């Protein structure tokens, strides 16, 4: 059972905080923009709302942030009114927001000067996964702090993955999102093309699910060839270009 300050109890942060409470952790929370329903529910579960970071509790094991951008994360950590100015505890700080890796690294370096260790641990998957406690959590930072935090993080995520040194969690999240977003766009365009071409959509989906188009080159072509250092052409660029022009 850990003593935790959770900063940011919005769409994702609220269910994440709730799962920590359900797993018997002691929780204080801070969010001046939280909706009244979330505040009321958290209080009913025994959480304490702090009105200012000046009132940061003593004897914390973890401080967790789940905020919209790096600007807000910096403000509540290393800003003029951030936690670094109001505590002497040697807690582990965990940022679960999706922010620039350079911001994660900068915050980590500044906190380290004050004796505070940091993990960047952005989450993947959907709001329902946050509710169910089945998020994917991608962690960057020192391995020792990761090991100390894993059991607590597993209250919020079914898959907790150590990605490497400071900033690695943020980098992996952005890389994953980059591929996921592009694949989503391509999928929508492909199905729209099938519709406009008069091809039955169910047929197109069934067919493409058996090829690299649906299964993904990451699962087929790359393990079979590229990851084995075999980069010999399997399909000429000129032929690929010809097909795209059709």
Predicted features along the sequence, with ranges:
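Mid-domain beta-loop-alpha active-site segment that forms a flexible
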Residues: 167-193, 236-243
């Amino acid at each position: 059972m850990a003593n935790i300050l959770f900063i940011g109890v919005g769409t994702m942060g609220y269910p994440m905080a709730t799962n920590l409470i359900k797993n018997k952790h002691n929780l204080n929370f801070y969010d001046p923009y939280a909706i009244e329903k979330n505040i009321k529910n958290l209080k009913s579960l025994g959480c304490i709302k702090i009105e200012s970071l000046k009132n940061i509790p003593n004897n914390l094991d973890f401080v967790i942030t789940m905020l919209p951008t790096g600007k807000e994360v910096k403000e509540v950590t290393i800003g003029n009114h951030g936690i670094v100015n109001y505590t002497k505890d040697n807690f582990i700080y965990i940022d679960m927001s999706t922010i620039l890796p350079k911001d994660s690294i900068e915050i980590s370096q500044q906190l380290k000067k004050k004796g505070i260790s940091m993990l960047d641990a952005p989450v993947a998957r959907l709001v329902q996964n946050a509710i169910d406690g089945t998020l994917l959590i991608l962690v960057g930072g020192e391995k020792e702090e990761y090991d100390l935090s894993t059991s607590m993080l597993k209250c919020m995520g079914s898959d907790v993955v150590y990605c490497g040194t400071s900033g690695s969690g943020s980098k992996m999240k952005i890389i994953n999102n980059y591929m996921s977003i592009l694949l989503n766009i391509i999928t929508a365009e492909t199905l729209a093309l099938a519709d406009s071409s008069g091809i039955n959509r169910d047929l197109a989906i069934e067919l493409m699910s058996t090829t690299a188009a649906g299964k993904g080159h990451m699962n087929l072509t790359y393990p079979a060839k590229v990851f084995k250092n075999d980069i010999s052409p399997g399909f000429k660029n000129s032929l690929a270009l010809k097909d795209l022009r059709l």
